[in-house]
């Protein structure tokens, strides 16, 4: 029930008939005036009228329809006022719990892949934006009526997993410590193993360097030793056991390479071992993500792509391509020459962008991750019979994602290439928290969530709030902080500020909903359209009604354009105006029953819009805070 859409259509039909132009052309040019006093809808006439505007504008002076109250020409603009009474009746005579969540006419089958963290340590601050963006996109697309499949790509064949398994092997393949979260336990072993290997490697390099190179490497070694000492302080016995075992080995890197090779070949013994420890990591991930109410439909293992020969089939096809070239001693694809202007346009690749050669294999014959991504993309499209695949991946993967689309085009998967979308996002920083060191200290999502929980708990204690809501409020704070900013912009926020109950936060939207719900819960009246005083539909009440009317359009555009920040901004604006109004005018205490009835309807509309908007974002609306 898109009331604003109907009003725009009504205006477009009239203007098109008067000017003798297409209704579609008029409709797409209808905008909102910058100031309320100018009107509710606006048209820039030069975009529609060629020649003498004033002469043609005379045809547009008089009009009154069902949803359009009146129109007027001001200079080069045609401005229209909505019929508030009819807008009100149209909305509230049919208002239900699904209001605004407009279903798309032709739903698609869409895969959303997000998070896909390496299963070697807990999810950390670097994954936070990815996982919330991905989950919210999936929820929004489902709410729009699409069939959505949410997937997690388990990268279990790379060097990082092999380093973890090597460390576990040296420790005798132990079981996780009983009082430590499993992914955290694995992360400590991985970090210890990795830093010990790095220190050993650097010390070997120092023996072969010139004096200037030596000084630079010594500084790097000093940094590693600081990290190693910090890790040792966390568990001296574990660290020393690993250090002694690694330093006693002649060629640890060769042994790690053998782990990679054997696992890729499908060695049965190694498969059982690695899958066991990977399951521990995924168990930890699921525990963390459950706090944010995030679930996946499928976990896809990279190793399965290798064992089922999907990667080899892709590699064979790429190696037989005419775009194959030698490049720095290895084999690569010259996608830059292969992709012409038409293909670049179709695949959303900037015309002048120089695409680096796509390296297919290392010098040792092993494939690179982009080749595996090609196989995985084909798998995702085919396995779900998908119309679109959305990869939620950081902006640093911009070029690899372009190479991926180019390679799919080269292989003849033109539809897949065109309908593979890279949902890119910038870095996130939480003020006062720092990732320190590439080998040791990470800030986990669990730690962030615990800090948020404590902040929310203290604020609720101060306010005498409902302590049962702590997790829901913490979740709302995180989701709002991330979803309120355009994904391609860098993001920085403060945990204290994002838990504010007063303004511009997830808890603030929840508080606004609870405020509206409380008013409705206290009312003993049944809503009746016959008892409404429409003359009271002025000021903030008028503005709130128009926002309620706009919600279906805002929802549709936000989801269709994958711009959830627009939905967040809308909900914030609605909350601001509602709270401003309620602080000035009473609802239940209003003595005039007809004015009171109108105000109850307005409160009801706000509560439905907030509840539905929050649900799309994955935020729970709370009846009491």
Swiss-Prot record:
Top-level EC class: ligase
Xref: SMART domains: Arg_tRNA_synt_N, DALR_1
Catalysed reactions, as listed in the record: tRNA(Arg) + L-arginine + ATP = L-arginyl-tRNA(Arg) + AMP + diphosphate
CDD domains linked to this entry: ArgRS_core
The protein's Enzyme Commission number: 6.1.1.19
InterPro entries (UniProt xref): Arg-tRNA-ligase, Arg-tRNA-synth_N, Arg-tRNA-synth_N_sf, ArgRS_core, DALR_anticod-bd, Rossmann-like_a/b/a_fold, tRNAsynth_Ia_anticodon-bd
Gene3D superfamilies: Arginyl tRNA synthetase N-terminal domain, HUPs, Isoleucyl-tRNA Synthetase, Domain 1
Any one GO MF annotation of this record: arginine-tRNA ligase activity
Pfam families attached to this UniProt entry: DALR_1, tRNA-synt_1d
Record's keyword terms, sorted: Aminoacyl-tRNA synthetase, ATP-binding, Cytoplasm, Ligase, Nucleotide-binding, Protein biosynthesis
Family membership: Belongs to the class-I aminoacyl-tRNA synthetase family.
Protein's name according to its UniProt entry: Arginine--tRNA ligase
